[in-house]
Amino acid sequence: MHILPGHKISLQKHYQRSEHWVVINGTAFITKGKKQFKLNANQSTFIKKGEVHRIENKSKKDLIMIEVQTGEYLEEDDIKRFKDIYKR
């Protein structure tokens, strides 16, 4: 995943998949359930299916992450968006 400075993904959850995120370059600001925290390069977090989550890039440089999805259904329509600045 490549998230530009000042951008973020929608606040969302997935019903049928979990995700493991690894930061390769930059700093990610993570919302995971009710927790908010920062991840730097070489740090990771696991998002359980059904858990509300978001990634934000509040820095001035690009954020590069690897996302590994696991579950029975991995299609992009397995998503419930709560807050989406892109109006999807």
Range-by-range predicted roles:
Residues M1-Q16, F29:
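Conserved short histidine dyad/triad with adjacent acidic residue
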Residues H2-P5, I24-T27, F46, R54:
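A structural signal for the main folded, soluble domain(s) of proteins
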Residues L11-Q12, T31, E56, I66:
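Beta-strand residues in well-ordered beta-sheet regions across diverse protein folds
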Residues Y15, E51-R54:
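Short, charged beta-turn/beta-strand-edge "cap" motif at the junction between a beta-strand
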Residues Y15-K34:
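Glycine- and acidic-residue-biased ligand/ion/polar-headgroup-sensing regions
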Residues K32-V52:
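Short acidic-glycine-tyrosine-enriched beta hairpin
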Residues R54-R88:
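Double-stranded beta-helix
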